Amino acid sequence: MKVEIGKIVNTHGIKGEIKVKSNSDFTETRFQPGELVIIERKNKEPLEFTIASYRMHKGLHMLTFEGINNINDIEYLKGETIMQERDHEEIELGEHEFYYSDIIGCTVFDDDDTPIGRVTEIFETGANDVWVVKGDKEYLIPYIADVVKDIDVEGRRIQITPMEGLLD
């Protein structure tokens, strides 16, 4: 099974480097040189690339692919989704830890079982992760025990008890 690990937001320089906004965990492992990625393209066949280099720059992940040395060879992929086989999910997790790919796409419900929206993104803040939940509005839900009460990965369902003002 493939999981989404990021989106190509732009190119950088003239030597074929791309800027990637990650929506994945374990980026140090996923974006290492030698790792295989799949670029999903709208209404076209997916493309496979091997990562040649990786670095961080201004909060974005900067990648080059083997065999790509020119901006003209990569520019057409701006806006496309980067996927990877789910084999990195073998990393052992602690209690109450989940892979981003297990959380993104889940529907979030409040105490009354009213759907709030779907988790579309996860931000790491240092103290705890924050989930972006899009429904009628966009909400920022902290992943803390006082708020997140139950996560059913198989059922793609998350139950929360919103703090005062969280859903205003």
From Swiss-Prot:
Q: What does this protein do?
A: An accessory protein needed during the final step in the assembly of 30S ribosomal subunit, possibly for assembly of the head region. Essential for efficient processing of 16S rRNA. May be needed both before and after RbfA during the maturation of 16S rRNA. It has affinity for free ribosomal 30S subunits but not for 70S ribosomes.
Recorded hits in SUPFAM superfamilies, A to Z, give: PRC-barrel domain, Translation proteins
Per the entry's comment, what about the domains? The PRC barrel domain binds ribosomal protein uS19.
Q: What is this protein called?
A: Ribosome maturation factor RimM
Question: Repressor: present as a keyword of the record?
Answer: no
Q: Which GO terms describe its cellular component?
A: cytoplasm; ribosome
Family (UniProt): Belongs to the RimM family.
Q: Which GO terms describe its molecular function?
A: ribosome binding
Name the gene for this chain: rimM
- List the Pfam families hit by this protein, alphabetically: PRC_RimM (PF24986), RimM (PF01782)
| Main localization (coarse) | cytoplasm
Q: Which GO terms describe its biological process?
A: ribosomal small subunit biogenesis; rRNA processing
